[in-house]
Amino acid sequence: DASRAERFAQRPQSRLWRAEMAEQLATFDYHAVMHDDATLLQWLLAVRDIGLTQLQGVPTTEDVLPVLATRISFIRESNFGVLFDVQSKADADSNAYTAFNLPLHTDLPTRELQPGLQFLHCLVNNATGGESVFVDGFAIAEALRQETPDLFRILCETPVEFRNRSRTSDYH
């Protein structure tokens, strides 16, 4: 049996990333992930260590995403449902259903159990704009810790209450 120190030394190491990661984004073939356990493992390790990957060759049908997600775990439902379409609606009750340009954000921080993994699956995009921008929050926190340790400490020690109110729900 490995000692506690040996197990600690062998633990997964997250990799912080910045803008240059876009050129080296870990990319996997959808069909290989679905049918080859070794590729599935490599994909899951990349998700664990980097936090963001891309699957190519994913069919553009609605039934594909739940099959992919349940290949690795169960799907946790939210007030948006099991799956939801991000689209512009006239009577939107969430920014997800508007054409607004959203700033960088974290989805569902009001939840006791935030999403462990999220998938974005583009079926059709006839609109201009709508690009997704991703940032590594841990890299931002590390830069803050290095550059302004006092502000980093305040961020770590100050409780923040998140709130989400809509016509049908109130989470905080």
Which role does the model predict for each range below?
Residues 1-13:
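Hydrophobic, ordered structural segments
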Residues 18-172:
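Active-site environment of non-heme Fe oxygenases that use a 2-His-1-carboxylate facial triad
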